[in-house]
């Protein structure tokens, strides 16, 4: 469960290393975001010569959370940390590689590109 001020790792090669959630999109007073939800983030740490710079405000999709996601069969998939993938204005990933596993819940029309780039889908 990601909320405002939550710090997330970046799971792509866009140049950002760490981002902070500044808004959960989808509803006027929505508090939490889970896996597959879109959030507004600001870049807190970035590498030199990356595609994004520190202080930039971006859109991102949550791909891993410590809270996890519950499946229909009752199983829960949790991760060691919270991670997001940065998106451009067309909701496409900025990076060309995805690091770490992603869940099957991202397998929608919007995020098939992220699922296909990921090394492992749980």
Swiss-Prot record:
Protein name: Large ribosomal subunit protein uL14
Family in the record: Belongs to the universal ribosomal protein uL14 family.
Role description: Binds to 23S rRNA. Forms part of two intersubunit bridges in the 70S ribosome.
GO molecular function: large ribosomal subunit rRNA binding; structural constituent of ribosome
NCBIfam families: rplN_bact
Gene3D superfamilies: Ribosomal protein L14
Residues spanning the signal sequence: none
